[in-house]
Amino acid sequence: MADAKDFLFEIGTEEMPSAPLNNAVKQLGTMIAKGLDEAGLAHGEVRVISSPRRLAALVADVATATDEVHEIKRGPAANIAFDADGNATKAAQGFARKCGVAAEGLVRREDTDGREYVFAEKNIPSAPATPILTALCEKTIAGLQWPNYRSQRWGHEHATFVRPVRWICCLLGEDVVPVSFADVTSGNTTRGHRVLGPGDHVVASPAVYEQVLEDAGVLSAERRREAILAGIAEVEADRPGCHVDTPKKVFEEVINLCEWPTVLVGTFDEEFLKVPHEIICESMLTNQRYFPIYDGEGKLTREFVVVSNSKPENAERVIDGNERVVRARLDDAKFFYEEDLKISLDEFRERLAKVAFQEKLGSVLAKSERIEQLALAIAREAHLGAHLAADAGRAAHLCKADLVSNAVVEFTSQQGVMGGYYATAMGENDEVAHAIRDHYRPRFAGDELPEGTAGCIVACADKLDTIAGIFAIGEPPTGSSDPYALRRAAIGIINILRDRLPIDPTSLIDFALELYSEQGIEFDAAEVAQQVRDFFHGRLVSMARDEKVPADTVAAVSAVHIIAPSVFFARCAALDEARKNDAETFDNLATAYARAAHISKPELGVEYDRSLMGEAELALADASEAAQTAVDAALVAEDYPAAFAALAALRAPIDRFFDEVMVMDKDEQLRDNRLKLLNRFEAVFSGIANIGELARKK
């Protein structure tokens, strides 16, 4: 067994962007561990340390050499490897070549299965770790991927990296491992903070690496996170009731923007609090990575948190500089908002004629007109009052107007939000303003639904218009490709219709496509409508499975092609509960239903002749008629537990029927009459669920 030493591989660069750095951190540890394993170098824990200017792997207890190995590989069967004369066949020669041995050296022996095979055996001598580590590090640094970021060529070679590589520190114990990349060769030095610890710093061994960094003004990502969180906690403790808003994406980016974080608090002028807080906060978060501070009532305060890449003694100068920067940014936001208030939303809306929605689907103005008509149709379908329908129509009329406003052009994520402010400013009522503000919701999984009913209507209309249009031009989602986010839009509609607007979207899909036809878009309306219905149905099934509804329950309900979300999920819940309460009945009923479906002939219809029936047949006929009446009444009342209880009552008569009646009688008249009765039995289920899809427990 070889000795073991700690190993360090550090790539030093110019400041790397946060997102690719995080991605590289995930890659580096995996690549190093995999490379060591494949090379046969024993090792301990692999840790990755990063900062804006470095990416490093620290590996504990790396063997200084590989172990000597006696390698045995099994090849083809002996009768395939050698011909009748004992000569090696092509199969044996290929196997030997692959294993790096001569065909004559292959060994024949019986394996555990009793058959004779050929085996290649060879001794692989121990190899020193240093050359292996050199090759691994050079392969790793060249193999790091930078998705969504263009790698650039540095030095005189063809090597590329996301930022210029300035130094490489690579050590196995106290010994330098030679590594070269882009005209840079490895050594035993690292570099510290540009201001707090400039220049080269000797790393005597991997064990002292983190301490050397800290002494040079560089903390690891974990330490930086802890320091920032502690600083923010102190800020909040000094301001009882206040809360520092730290969105995850921005927070992670800030961690990767500094090497020695210091949490400071700055302020901006009171006048900026008159501007909608959403654009103030977005300006601070996205442009400067400042964290807003809210008071105990959730209102934005004049203070903000800035994370400085320096020590506290520089605080006054750093705060002053950041306050000057934030004032310039907020001046811009205030200017955009005040200029927008000089123009009505109706005037903004007319400008949408020059904004394309989609190349083949016309302008955003045309889209807003379709949304308005769809919103009114949804209000009618939901049987809402005239006042609420009018609010939904007005909100739909104006919902896209803010897209051409100054504030939204600058802060695109605030589309809808700014429209809500502008609607209030021009005298629209709260329902209209809130609907405009909320109509993009839900924007992602777990997002809130629109606050008001009008907002739910406009949100559904907007999303359904997009889905219908993209399907009409033949560009639906395929596999993992969904460039128009139609799956997300469909899930948004389903969540709204499930929780807030219990309506069936079938007729609305047809109407949405009709509006495109009136616009001159050519497509097969019936075919596309079916595609859209199938698309919604697929999302319903997927969501039910994600919610852990049993797969066979989902299959039973989805088999009757319901796309009204509230109905679909209510039926799934009722069937699942019925099965839990009386599993035996539904298992047996499922078996009987499947048997009936297997032999039935739908073309015979359901009109049977009672005069040809015996007692068991009459019992099933009476039970089917009674169950049909009960199911129909339950469906009208949306009492799905009652509907499934009515189906459960069919178990005894169908079991008796199959026990006592020969369905496929030689007498054609009797046979057909019994098949018609089974058709009638099946028809009872057709409007609620296909019980035959249920799993049978034996």
List each language-model region with its residue ranges.
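Amphipathic alpha-helical "coupling" segments that flank catalytic cores
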Residues: M1-K698
